[in-house]
């Protein structure tokens, strides 16, 4: 697909989209298939649930090792692409509600690895539409700040993906999505994204830049009486 893009005249860009270690609904993190166990020494410590504030040092060390393995795999993808497309822009997309779950404060060890820190990628893309569409503005602010602190990308090297509306019956969600887009632009991100075209056309969503210009409150002119 990179070859197709460059043949069409586009600059090479490669997005690593939402890579993470999957977590089951009951909080078990999926680190125990045969390949993963071999990578972690054969008998990695059990983590019954990642949704805990009392993980042991050994459990945290396993999560750190999982993060290093994840970072290594994403770096290998980028390096492979750049062998054929030198200078390719690399982007990492991080879905904040999953990887920065407040109930699992140590999940970031595995799913927001320090190996992703700047300048591992050219652009950090942040997405959090589950928070946006439920009006959880505070979670967005906290999540963005936490991602910036952990990975160190300046806002000028960030993109923000504010969301989409799957069902026509939920079209009211466009309002908080639009507001989140405006907030990201005020933060100074390099680009914002709303998707997808079928839903945008279905609901007639349109973004307007209607902010008023600054005006002088009065003209200080002396008129003859």
Where are these regions (language model features)?
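Alpha-helical structural signal in soluble globular domains
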Residues: 3-4, 76, 80-84, 112-120, ...
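A structural signal for short, well-ordered beta-strand segments and their strand-loop junctions
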Residues: 13-17, 89-93, 192-194
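A generic short-segment signal for beta-strand/edge and adjacent turn/coil regions
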Residues: 59-60, 91-95, 160-163
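Substrate-binding cleft/loops of secretory-pathway carbohydrate-active enzymes
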Residues: 84-134
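Substrate-binding cleft of secreted/luminal carbohydrate-active enzymes
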Residues: 12, 121-138, 143-225
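Active-site-proximal loop/turn and secondary-structure-junction residues that shape catalytic pockets
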Residues: 18-22, 94-98, 130, 165, ...
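Polysaccharide-binding and catalytic clefts of secreted carbohydrate-active enzymes
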Residues: 1-84, 95-112
């Amino acid at each position: 697909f990179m070859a197709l893009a460059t043949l069409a005249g586009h600059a090479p860009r490669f997005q690593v989209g939402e890579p993470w270690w999957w977590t089951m609904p009951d909080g078990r993190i999926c680190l125990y298939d045969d390949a993963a166990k071999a990578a972690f020494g054969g008998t990695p410590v059990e983590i019954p649930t990642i949704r805990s504030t009392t993980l042991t040092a050994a459990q945290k060390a396993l999560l750190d090792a999982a993060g290093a393995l994840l970072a290594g795999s994403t770096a290998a993808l980028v390096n492979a692409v750049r062998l054929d497309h030198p200078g390719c822009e690399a982007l990492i997309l991080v879905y904040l509600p999953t990887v920065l779950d407040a109930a699992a404060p140590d999940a970031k060890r595995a799913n927001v690895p320090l190996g992703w820190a700047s300048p591992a990628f050219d652009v950090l893309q942040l997405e959090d539409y589950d928070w946006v569409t439920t009006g959880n503005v505070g979670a967005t602010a906290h999540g963005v700040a936490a991602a910036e602190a952990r990975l160190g990308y300046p806002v000028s090297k960030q993109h923000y993906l504010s969301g989409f509306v799957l069902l026509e019956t939920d079209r009211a969600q466009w309002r908080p999505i639009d507001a989140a887009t405006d907030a990201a632009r005020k933060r100074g991100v390099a680009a914002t994204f709303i998707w997808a075209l079928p839903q945008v056309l279905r609901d007639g969503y349109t973004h307007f830049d209607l902010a008023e210009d600054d005006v002088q409150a009065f003209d200080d002119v002396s008129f003859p009486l």
